[in-house]
């Protein structure tokens, strides 16, 4: 049926901030939906609170509202815009839950807004555990024995009847939030309690556990006519029991028989038909590996993380097709953009293997519980495409960027002596490290059957891993052979003998190298096994023409000719990435993406990569992208002229450069991932565009940067380097406390601490770092002043500063975890001018061509530089959106030779707007048990939101509400702070009391507050009698927790338990007094009943331009 003609304006709900369980895949889905509707001439209104997304660009929708994803704000937008329809299925679980609230409130009926795509009754059939169970029973689809409950006692009674273990699945949550596997009653009590609290309707499903069965997913599409197709089937390498977001996933399924595949495919089509889904749908099955028995585990009646993976794996644009269906089209009326010939009714066919590997945040959280279960813990994922499983697996591993370029280095040298018992013990645990223990077990010649019995991983996958290990063994034997034949034991002679061997004896060794490359082994991995250098391995390959070809993703296994330049590498194959007949390399530029989403490197860098490509297209350049993240907009085949789905690893990038011969490579916009590649690529002859590699080094090398600051007359906090604990103490005495300490060999704020006393320093040096001449520790003065952040653009001569951001938390909290307001409110004119002057001097002094990010601290009236990043930063999307200045486009054009004057921009600091914008961090602590929620120099947030308004307090309120703070004006506040913070906390406590909240405090804090004349109820510590602090939190008597801590003291351990209890009970826990003050400001705004207006970003910017 044709498109509906009654839809003139449609509202799309986005998914909000990046959190574990809901990442950047919804930015990809939302941008596709916006594009589809605008192509059809429909006016698009978008609401999303995440400024880092591409979907919130003003050119993506006619009206963009950066407002909290809360029912009251959506209602205000509906009242103002009067849309004809609403699409909620592109906003993940957040979108679905909001749609349900809007339907139940009657607001959609009142304003005659149609819920487009899947209906609310269909959504409830899939999401409400009770209704879903009944529906499956009605159509004869098997589900595990289960019961829907709303109390812990009900859960216990059911588990007692069916026996342990049981799985808990909350209704209306994302990423398995609140769920888990309970092995006994004690575990069930805790998991069920969390699950009930996490569920939108306080409902959980307790079901019989089928751990060990295969987990298989089907991505299905249906239109209003009832046409259904399966787009992709995917098999989890990990058996049931590990959340699919934390599993290794293969597409297409690798171990199913045709009978099993057809059985599950028919079941999937039957289920989507019964649920009357209109659009995309993900269905998860558990399959008994020993019979044809299966269970339906879950149905997601919306675009999901798996949808993004299936889209990139097949080339079938699921979100785009679902959006077309939502406005009335049927599948046979939608054409396939990849082939340009087939319709969307044509099921994709794959002649390659796709693998997804999860990216976990445990490199940031050493003490976190690494055990995997039904509650997701991965922050992101990578995808790889190969002609065989081994190739795809090793590519995906390289793409993870976890300091393990390949499996050969996955277990440290010390682990060579591991006993078999220890390996078997580790195999029995389901942790993020299980893959490396699997390989270690195979190396130790533990039988595959024994490994299978312990892990339930299919023998097919274990054999593939054994194939990889066999190459290691063959190359190691080759090294021994050549060393025995070499008199001088000389590396060059070994290389010559290796070459000679390859040329002679029927090229046996050359064949081994060729087969190893076909299986995905990197030069690094082969180097580690043979004893040769990477450069030697590379030279041997090139000499014998062992280089990758590039195959095209075409959705149809070559049955139809494809138009889409979307490639992956393969050895010993015909090359399908044929360059244009006319050489155009002087108008061709490669942009490096940012890889998987992780803490410290989020969707902001995908935003930057995409905007760089758009700028190159504006200039008439052919744009190329290398990236490996299936969730992102940058890996949409429509964004760049040619997309390479490859690891961001030196060898893989160099191979693409050799294939495409671009004019240059842009590394500024892919975060630290791309920046780290700049030097090795330049060393190999690539032209790094923008700021030179040597100038990047001047910004990042401590000594060189200090020399520049001295030359420019710019201050920075005093600091020195210690190579021993004794020296650290001497430096500390010289500089004075407090101090910032960090290991010199760790980037990105990892293992950084603020120490306030000699005891703090002793604890840090003992437990946090290994200090030696090879691994020195950097010690700097900690100036707890106002932190200022600037993103600027330089064309080599002039500097544009869109605006100045002021951090709400003082220095000491990582900039990514700080709230930031724009424009800066607390700067006097002299300080502002000095910051602008310093920024211009640094940009010019470092010969920046592109973007520079600078962080300052203003302390006792002086301005100090604390960090300079010669690349795009996390705040670029935020500052670009609220000022209307497209920083990445300006920077890219400057790199390509266009001055600001040529582009029509004036240099200097831009005028301040009349409105305020506040950026707030968002954390995923609830998903990561045993992680301390306290904020410090090491980044912990996974995403961000924005609040905007003409009133700063209201903008602050919106930002805190959007970030997940539950803001209300009743209940109690628990205050327990370190001695150094007691004086500063007093006025905050008085403000809480003025709002009518009851004050609770631990003994030391309570005594101080009483002495100040403040009425406070003292509560026992955790080690004391009951009811204690934890009991009060669990009983709901406390609505806010303010807790600061002291390093290495007993209260820190008490504080950890308090902070965790707050997080696990959904209570705001504030570990910075500045954040507490900001919350109070928001609460006071609410108390005054100030009106909360909504206004589109376009309308704000329109006033700025007038």
Curated annotation (Swiss-Prot):
Annotated stretches, region: Carboxyphosphate synthetic domain: 1-401
Family listed: Belongs to the CarB family.
Function, as annotated: Large subunit of the glutamine-dependent carbamoyl phosphate synthetase (CPSase). CPSase catalyzes the formation of carbamoyl phosphate from the ammonia moiety of glutamine, carbonate, and phosphate donated by ATP, constituting the first step of 2 biosynthetic pathways, one leading to arginine and/or urea and the other to pyrimidine nucleotides.
Family annotation (PROSITE patterns): ATP_GRASP (PS50975), CPSASE_1 (PS00866), CPSASE_2 (PS00867), MGS (PS51855)
Source organism superkingdom: Bacteria
Binding site for ATP 1: 129, 169, 175-176, 208, 210, 215, 241-243, 284, 298
UniProtKB keywords: Amino-acid biosynthesis, Arginine biosynthesis, ATP-binding, Ligase, Magnesium, Manganese, Metal-binding, Nucleotide-binding, Pyrimidine biosynthesis, Repeat
Source organism of the structure: Natranaerobius thermophilus (strain ATCC BAA-1301 / DSM 18059 / JW/NM-WN-LF)
Positions of Mg(2+) 2 binding: 298, 300
Protein name: Carbamoyl phosphate synthase large chain
Disulphide bonds in the chain: none
A Pfam family reported for this protein in Swiss-Prot or TrEMBL: CPSase_L_D3
Domain ATP-grasp stretches: 133-327, 706-896
Molecular function per GO: ATP binding; carbamoyl-phosphate synthase (ammonia) activity; carbamoyl-phosphate synthase (glutamine-hydrolyzing) activity; metal ion binding
Annotated stretches, region: Oligomerization domain: 402-577
Record-listed Mn(2+) 3 binding positions: 855, 867
Binding site for Mg(2+) 3: 855, 867
Binding site for Mg(2+) 4: 867, 869
Reaction(s) catalysed (UniProt annotation): hydrogencarbonate + L-glutamine + 2 ATP + H2O = carbamoyl phosphate + L-glutamate + 2 ADP + phosphate + 2 H(+)
GO biological process terms on file: 'de novo' UMP biosynthetic process; glutamine metabolic process; L-arginine biosynthetic process
Cofactor annotation: Mg(2+); Mn(2+)
Family annotation (PANTHER family): CARBAMOYL-PHOSPHATE SYNTHASE [AMMONIA], MITOCHONDRIAL (PTHR11405:SF53), CARBAMOYLTRANSFERASE FAMILY MEMBER (PTHR11405)
